[in-house]
Amino acid sequence: MQFKQDFFTQLPEFYSQVYPQGLSHPQWLAWSHDAAQLIGLTQPTDELLLGLSGNAAIDGATYYAQVYSGHQFGGYTPRLGDGRSIILGEAIGPNGAWDVALKGGGPTPYSRHGDGRAVMRSAVREFLVSEALYHLHVPTTRALAVIGSDMPVWRESQETAAITVRLARSHIRFGHFEFFCHSERGRADKLLQLLNFTITQHYPHLSCDPSGYKAWFLQVVQDTAKMIAHWQAVGFAHGVMNTDNMSILGDSFDFGPFAFLDTFQEDFICNHSDPEGRYAFGQQPGVGLWNLQRLAQALTPVIPSDDLIAILNQYQEALVQTYLLLMRAKLGLTTLDKSTAEQDKQDLELIGQFTVLMEKNQLDYAQTWRQFGQLDPRSQHSSLRDDFIDTHQFDTWYKAYQLRLGDVTDIAAWQTERNSVNPKYILRNYLAQEAIIAVEEGNLAPLQRLQQVLSQPFAEQVEHDELAKRPPDWGQGLIMSCSS
């Protein structure tokens, strides 16, 4: 790997230098060839294993943990930072640079009495979801690899330590800006330095002046809205949408007790540490705006409040338009025959009515959408109908859907298009759990198989049909722990 060190050299007050503590008896558990290509790598090697497990220095790496703060479950925590993630620098790839981070690399000055380690189960989950979201076309950070070990660590019980090697276009979070506004009062110079660095590195088409700052914040608002719209369309619940887990670039980031929906449930909670459902699936769009408002508060020293409010008011439109684009594709609604505002309203109602029916009839979210690839929309008797207990309500909705859809002349092409946007395979929690159990038993084959299947989520892959089935009773709607 070839590194540059722009963050390290230009922002010395934004991190602490710290070196990883090596894993004992490291071994490759997972490797993403797609992600490896981003930074010019091909195969996992013994030399790379030693370096990424913290047992040998990597040429050009600097090793540091970033400092930031954030709002966690609505309350401000003035000092957080990378408690178990150590960044090596920005690896230069064929199409740009990517931060390389060792998540689970050992304690840092921000570990807050923690051991700085990640357990194998959380490392595998983060790897799988990073790559699964990417192949579902959801904006996300990436995962290069998982490195296992025989090092014992204690959570609720004894587990083994592992490292997820994360790739990110940037590790700058909303919480970085909050830290230098709230926790380090009187350091507006540092806030401005961070803002100028972010724009120069990631928004080079913008200028570092008042007009450029406003254009940048608008881009952040729109990118965040688009990311969350993708979550809602694909049925993804993040679980811990604290502001320190929000990427400034609008990439899905810092995965913990996440879940993809099994049966559709608007108020689904995937995190057992969130009993009130602050971060429930249906709350995510509102939380996204709330988090952006906290970011806006941190930016008041450099952007006038009136401008920030005006830009925040554009969040809803960006969210709705992206969501409509994605959901129209899932339904095959490709024509607009009325004024945009009126059609948008009617389409949102049509989509909302369908998801309400899905929830009322306890239908599997992914499987139901996938059936549109076998649907003949010209037929008066939908193949979907038998899945609904309340067939009368479905018939009413289906007539409205057919009316909105209009004429479909090439059924085969229409069905192929539906299958290209409605995945057959998603990362169900029970599948991840089965793969983790197999790894614990020394068997990597189920993990490798799951990774391969999730890299082609829209393909039929009939030999893997069982991975598309609804979960067994024990795996339905699993709620995960934050411990990792």
Swiss-Prot record:
Entry cofactors: Mg(2+); Mn(2+)
Reactions this protein catalyses: L-seryl-[protein] + ATP = 3-O-(5'-adenylyl)-L-seryl-[protein] + diphosphate; L-threonyl-[protein] + ATP = 3-O-(5'-adenylyl)-L-threonyl-[protein] + diphosphate; L-tyrosyl-[protein] + ATP = O-(5'-adenylyl)-L-tyrosyl-[protein] + diphosphate; L-histidyl-[protein] + UTP = N(tele)-(5'-uridylyl)-L-histidyl-[protein] + diphosphate
Active site: 244
Disulphides: none
Binding annotation for Mg(2+): 245, 254
UniProt-listed HAMAP family: YdiU_SelO
Record protein name field: Protein nucleotidyltransferase YdiU
